[in-house]
């Protein structure tokens, strides 16, 4: 029973320790922000091609 509080405190300290990247960055690493922007613009283009017809009003920003 004496070890339980010590064990809990150690677990809390380990959980709050700053994490370290397991692999160092290389020059080939690409930031994810430009990839998300590309995906977003591609999805917008596809949405316009699929649902922007005169009968449908999905292009109005709804």
Swiss-Prot record:
Top-level taxon of origin: Eukaryota
Residues annotated as signal peptide: 1-22
Keywords of this entry: Amidation, Cleavage on pair of basic residues, Disulfide bond, Secreted, Signal, Toxin
Primary localization: secreted
GO MF term list: toxin activity
Stretches that traverse the bilayer: none
Coiled-coil features, chain-numbered ranges: none
One Pfam family here: Chi-conotoxin
Serine amide PTM sites in chain numbering: 60
Protein location: Secreted
InterPro entries linked to this entry: T-conotoxin
Processing after translation: Contains 2 disulfide bonds that can be either 'C1-C3, C2-C4' or 'C1-C4, C2-C3', since these disulfide connectivities have been observed for conotoxins with cysteine framework V (for examples, see AC P0DQQ7 and AC P81755).
GO cellular component: extracellular region
Tissue and organ expression note: Expressed by the venom duct.
Family per similarity comment: Belongs to the conotoxin T superfamily.
Domain comment quoted from the record: The cysteine framework is V (CC-CC).
Name of the molecule in the record: Conotoxin Gm5.2
């Amino acid at each position: 029973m004496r070890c339980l509080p010590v064990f809990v405190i150690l677990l809390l300290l380990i959980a709050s320790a700053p994490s370290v990247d397991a692999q160092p960055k290389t020059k080939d690493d690409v930031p994810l922000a430009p990839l998300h922007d590309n995906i977003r613009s591609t999805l917008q283009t596809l949405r316009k091609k699929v649902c922007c017809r005169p009968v449908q009003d999905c292009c109005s920003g709804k």
